[in-house]
């Protein structure tokens, strides 16, 4: 199998359940980071196709709920675990080792629940408006932009001392990966939303990445939870910005 195809399949297998997971070395995982936008395309296509075929047509509220459900199933809820963990750690106002203890705790607390409710609510509202407007292409754009933003975040902050996934992702967030992520994100937004909406979306996603990078630097680095929160947050930003544009 060609090396590029192995890395592409590795990215899709890691970020979705639609491609079988593969055994990989640390170098392979780092090389797969360049293919994160492709994994976003796979997720977006899987979320878009049922509705393009008419699933729950004329019932946008039901479609929006199903969209959130399909997105969760396709990704195994991987990124939302990061949302909950990071919300608990940040909401506790803890710093240093205590911050990381909470972040790594598999149990969910009150702030984690609130973070999930806000995140799911934002996705649902944005998707509902998208279904009303009929601009289904945004459903494909959102996951691509989210995973591209994750690559940029990984390039901005080094991994934390207690990070495993973060270390592998940061190692692969080189100039080529950043260029691919930014180019794919901007192009797909321009293809699916008006120019001003694209500008607004980039600004919001930039603010999310900046805020997460600031928090990560304060706490000594990033891990997979930061990246998951970045993906989920930027996906929601695309949907909400497009619904208002």
Swiss-Prot record:
Catalyzed chemical reaction(s): alpha-ribazole + adenosylcob(III)inamide-GDP = adenosylcob(III)alamin + GMP + H(+); alpha-ribazole 5'-phosphate + adenosylcob(III)inamide-GDP = adenosylcob(III)alamin 5'-phosphate + GMP + H(+)
GO cellular component: plasma membrane
Signal peptide: none
One Pfam assignment: CobS
Residue spans crossing the bilayer: 35-55, 108-128, 137-157, 176-196, 197-217, 222-242
Compartments where located: Cell inner membrane
Requisite cofactors: Mg(2+)
The entry's keywords: Cell inner membrane, Cell membrane, Cobalamin biosynthesis, Magnesium, Membrane, Transferase, Transmembrane, Transmembrane helix
EC number: 2.7.8.26
Broadest EC class assigned to this enzyme: transferase
Protein family: Belongs to the CobS family.
PANTHER family documented for this protein: ADENOSYLCOBINAMIDE-GDP RIBAZOLETRANSFERASE
Protein name, per record: Adenosylcobinamide-GDP ribazoletransferase
Gene that specifies this protein: cobS
């Amino acid at each position: 199998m060609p090396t590029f195809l192995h890395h592409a399949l590795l990215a899709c297998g890691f970020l979705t359940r639609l491609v079988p997971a593969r055994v990989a070395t640390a170098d392979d995982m780092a090389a797969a980071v360049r293919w994160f936008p492709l994994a976003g395309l796979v997720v977006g296509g899987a979320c878009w196709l049922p509705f393009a075929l008419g699933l729950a047509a004329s019932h946008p509220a039901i479609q929006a709920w199903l969209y959130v459900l399909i997105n969760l199933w396709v990704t195994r809820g991987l990124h939302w675990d990061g949302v909950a963990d990071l919300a608990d750690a940040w909401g506790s106002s803890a710093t240093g080792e205590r911050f990381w203890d909470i972040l790594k705790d598999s149990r969910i607390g009150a702030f984690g629940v609130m973070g999930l409710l806000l995140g799911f609510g934002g996705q649902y509202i944005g998707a509902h408006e998208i279904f009303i407007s009929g601009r289904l292409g945004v459903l494909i754009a959102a996951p691509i932009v989210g995973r591209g933003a994750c690559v940029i975040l990984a390039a901005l902050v080094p991994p934390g001392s207690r990070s495993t996934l973060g270390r592998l992702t940061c190692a692969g967030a080189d100039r080529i990966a950043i260029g691919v992520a930014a180019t794919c994100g901007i192009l797909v937004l321009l293809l699916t939303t008006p120019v001003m909406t694209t500008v607004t979306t980039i600004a919001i996603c930039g603010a999310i990445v900046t805020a997460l990078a600031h928090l990560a630097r304060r706490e000594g680095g990033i891990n997979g939870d930061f990246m998951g929160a970045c993906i989920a947050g930027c996906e929601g930003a695309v949907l909400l910005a497009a619904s208002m544009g």
